[in-house]
Swiss-Prot record:
Keywords: Cytoplasm, RNA-binding. PANTHER family: SSRA-BINDING PROTEIN, TMRNA-BINDING COMPONENT OF TRANS-TRANSLATION TAGGING COMPLEX. The gene is smpB. Residues 123-142 have a biased composition (Basic and acidic residues). One of its GO terms (cellular component) is cytosol. InterPro entries: SmpB, SsrA-bd_prot, SsrA-bd_prot_CS. GO terms for molecular function: RNA binding. Pfam families: SmpB. It comes from Nitrosomonas eutropha (strain DSM 101675 / C91 / Nm57). Gene3D superfamilies: 2.40.280.10. This is SsrA-binding protein. Belongs to the SmpB family.
């Protein structure tokens, strides 16, 4: 079940491969995510010292958050993957000019997971081409429905 999606990533990037990663979260963050108070729109992933980190993911604390905890909505969060996956991603990002983007936050066996995509940036004309293709598919479906009615 999806919690939050980053639809803008599919508009701005060609997604080559997808990986599923765990996230290191605090208790108040888990509660806020379960309440749907998370946003991936401005988020991105960086590599530091051989580890992956999610930056810019906004998790709004619940008003009932504890007073002894100082919640930071946009703090850097560590991502958890197997070592061989991290090495593979680092190699592709450093050599081939790829970038890592968060695509979807979802539940898997009661745990919160983040789907990340190995992506290559789209140029402006690629974005326009994708938009035209989507529009044509919509028009084609509309014409087929009208013909069969």
């Amino acid at each position: 079940m999806s919690i939050a999606q980053n639809k803008k990533a599919f508009h701005d990037y060609f997604i080559e491969e997808k990986y599923e990663a765990g996230i290191v979260l605090e208790g108040w963050e888990v509660k806020a995510i379960r309440a749907g108070r998370v946003q991936l729109k401005e988020a991105y992933i960086v590599i530091r010292r051989g580890e992956l980190f999610l930056i810019g993911c906004h998790i709004s604390p619940l008003p009932t958050a504890s007073t002894h905890v100082n919640p930071d909505p946009v703090k850097t969060r560590k991502l958890l993957l197997h070592a061989f996956q991290i090495k593979e991603l680092i190699g592709k990002v450093e050599r081939a000019g790829y970038t890592l983007v968060p695509l979807d936050m979802h539940y898997k066996a009661g745990k919160i997971k983040l789907e990340i995509g190995l992506a290559k940036g789209k140029k402006q004309y690629d974005k326009r081409e994708s938009e035209k293709r989507k529009e044509w598919e919509r028009d084609k479906q509309r014409l087929l429905r009208m013909r069969h009615s």
